[in-house]
Amino acid sequence: TLRSSSAASDVYKRQRSNEDLFIEFCEDFEFNPVIFNSFQSVGDKRLPIYHTNVMMCVATDYVIICLDSIDDKKQRKNVSNFIIESGKKLIEISEKQVESFAGNMLELINENGESILVMSKSAEDSLDENQRNTITNHSRIISCDINTIEVCGGGSTRCMMAEIFLPKK
């Protein structure tokens, strides 16, 4: 996952990624690699989370993340420190909130330069008052009920949108 606004990057150590190639890519494009493993509880097992957009949303001024899904304490601390040192506000969410798609959000910037955080109704409903206040200090929240997509498809709003980081012409 690339975060162009902060020149940072993250990757999971999984069968689907190559750490050496990732580091080389980051060096070539002047990104800072942040490598970690992330898991979710399924029954009595801890199973891998394969996409960062399930447990993390990176916005201009803040990062919403489920640090509890990073089981390795050193990796968790590295991720947390990287976020804080980048100058972004850290907003922690729980695994229960991840199940409600609270990590699957996307920041959009409208034509007036206003930050808008798009999320599902279930994600918004899972936020506590402090989390909601922290977000709304930086972004306007827009949510919609996409329960059918979340239940049948297993994804949420972030999975349905793509970012474009091209300069305006």
Protein language model annotation of sequence segments:
Residues 1-8, 12:
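Single conserved hydrophobic/aromatic residue that forms the stacking wall/gate
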Residues 21-133:
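Redox- and metal-dependent alpha/beta enzyme cores, enriched for Fe-S-associated oxidoreductases
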Residues 100-112, 117, 151-169:
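Conserved, well-ordered active-site substructure
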